[in-house]
Amino acid sequence: MVRYRVRSPSEPSHEVYRQQLHGQEQGHHGQEEQGLSPEHVEVYERTHGHSHYRRRHCSRRRLRRIHRQQHRSCRRRKRRSCRHRRRHRRGCRTRRRTCRKH
């Protein structure tokens, strides 16, 4: 999930900012997003107060959070399966190996 900053009604639209930044009107909104270089993205975020930019999918904090959730859920699953079944089961061993890789 990507969070977007909510724009107040009095604040100018996204396109107005872009026109001021580039000095020209561009085409479709989706194409504009792809046309920005990484330097322009950083400048744009700083000058226009966008804390969550759309193209930034995986921040380190987000990746770490996802990784921790997977690891925890994986551990939980392993414990449950081991308690109710025999300890020396192949599935449990292979799961343990894959869990430690993450």
Swiss-Prot record:
Its BP terms in the Gene Ontology are:
chromosome condensation; nucleus organization; spermatid development; spermatogenesis
Q: Which UniProt keywords apply?
A: Chromosome, Developmental protein, Differentiation, DNA condensation, DNA-binding, Nucleosome core, Nucleus, Phosphoprotein, Spermatogenesis
Q: GO CC annotations?
A: nucleosome; nucleus
PTM comment for this protein?
Answer: Proteolytic processing into mature chains is required for histone eviction during spermatogenesis. Transition proteins (TNP1 and TNP2) are required for processing.
Q: Where found in the cell?
A: Nucleus; Chromosome
Instruction: Write down the InterPro entries for this protein, in alphabetical order.
Output: PRM2 (IPR000492)
Record carries keyword Phosphoprotein: yes
Q: In which tissues is it expressed?
A: Testis.
Which superkingdom is the protein from?
Answer: Eukaryota
In which broad location class does this protein mainly occur, judging by the first location in its UniProt entry? nucleus
Concerning PANTHER family, the annotation shows:
PROTAMINE-2
Question: What family is this protein classified in?
Answer: Belongs to the protamine P2 family.
Q: What is this protein called?
A: Protamine-2
Q: Which organism is it from?
A: Pan paniscus (Pygmy chimpanzee)
